[in-house]
Amino acid sequence: MAKTNLNDFDKIIVLDFGSQYNQLITRRIRDFGIYSELLPHDLSIEKIKKMAPKGIIFSGGPNSVYDEGALKVDPEIFKLGIPILGICYGMQLMSYDLGGKVEKADNSEYGRADIEVTDPNAVLFEGLPKEQYVWMSHGDLVTKAPEGFKVTAKSKNCPISAIANDEKKFYGIQFHAEVRNSEYGLDILKNFAFNVCDAKANWTMDDFIEMQVDEIREKVGDKKVILGLSGGVDSSVTATLLHKAIGDQLTAIFVDHGMLRKDEGDQVMQALNKDLGVNIIRVNAQKRFLDKLKGVTDPEQKRKIIGKEFIEVFNEEAKKLKDVDFLAQGTLYTDVIESGTNTAQTIKSHHNVGGLPEDMHFELIEPLRKLFKDEVRELGEKLGIPHDLVWRQPFPGPGLAIRVLGEVTEDKLKIVRESDAILRDEIKKAGLQEDIWQYFTVLPGIRSVGVMGDGRTYDYTIGIRAVTSIDGMTADFAKLPWDVLSKISTRIVDECDHINRVVYDITSKPPSTIEWE
């Protein structure tokens, strides 16, 4: 039977105490096929009861539970009869609230630590080795477990690394099972989700699509919706999902600012408009944007100009449409989490629709606001969007304008666009496109002496940036095979005008950012 709302799914909620890893916990649970949400630590008991979760996870956090102002939970949460897992600060909080003792550690643990499972019957460690390495990040520790709890694991500097109360189904781990640095972290979370909470893996993208289509139709009725289409993954998937739900009641405004990658605008129109039938108005505004950028060299100023101009073009087109009641945007769950509030009233500037005039009164519709990025990609493929479009490289809103260092001109954009197309073509030919997080070319504005044919040249340099990463927060430069780099370099110099040198960026993030501007 199809699910019609979120209450039809088994779910495990994560209460947020400020850990840098809190989103990861939610992602890991969803990866198991179980719906999960990250919610405020002070979520009311009434709301928790209404959600009827199969389990609750307390995230880690930077506070000390014994300090004034430390983040707390309503003590009634321990009387709900719902399984609870405390991670790091979450374990300390549960221990403290239930009568245990938490103190500052003599030796803080940050990074890898080896633990020993001391209880062979520990449910969280069922089927796992007695000795394993985990990721610790704490300055406090539990020095006395609450009454009714047993210690199930220890480390050299943390004698109480895990605790359990099997009767009440309360568990705590001092380490971060959600990060990949914990050897069997995912297995520990699985044991909690399936063996302790008895949750069913019934969260599927097919159900989500059906649920969202029903919700969109109910909310929109016979009214009209507009969407600012950037050509990126989020807005493209939003447009396709809305079209599936309401057809031509949706109008997508695609502002082509001339800073897109080679053939990208045409590819978007082919995939979404011609193949999938989405109603799109394409505005060719390349000259308008270039005129505004003339003489501008500061990267932040370029971003602001492009963002402001995008809004103005979008506004002009939106005003031409009659009787529009809804504005759609591709807000993701990460945006909702980062805002810390209900973002239903927030227009996101990075979706290029921020700053709408006060006389344009739209109700906001955000069909992706419960999904993470990789779930959006899965949704896009389910909706029939071409694989290459769904899995395209991350691309900044200002586009190639920030890959041309200094002033942006039509000739410089052409150089970056052509060199980037060559890079992507050779990476794809080498079968490396799925192994590299992001790769692109930049025009740093450096000119150098070269020799081409029998003559001396004084032309531009192209920089190649290719990185590997898991989440984009940190990144290493990709170790591309020399023969692939050689082919890329040769083709760029041969096929791109005014280029006589190619360099490869071998800097990690940090200290560098992935983009050059």
Swiss-Prot record:
Tagged with keyword ATP-binding: yes
Active site, per annotation: C88 (nucleophile), H176, E178
Main enzyme class: ligase
Keywords per UniProt: ATP-binding, Glutamine amidotransferase, GMP biosynthesis, Ligase, Nucleotide-binding, Purine biosynthesis
Protein name (Swiss-Prot/TrEMBL): GMP synthase [glutamine-hydrolyzing]
Catalytic reaction list: XMP + L-glutamine + ATP + H2O = GMP + L-glutamate + AMP + diphosphate + 2 H(+)
Stretches assigned to the Glutamine amidotransferase type-1 domain: 11-202
InterPro entries: Class_I_gatase-like, GATASE, GMP_synth_C, GMP_synth_GATase, GMP_synthase, GMPS_ATP_PPase_dom, NAD/GMP_synthase, Rossmann-like_a/b/a_fold
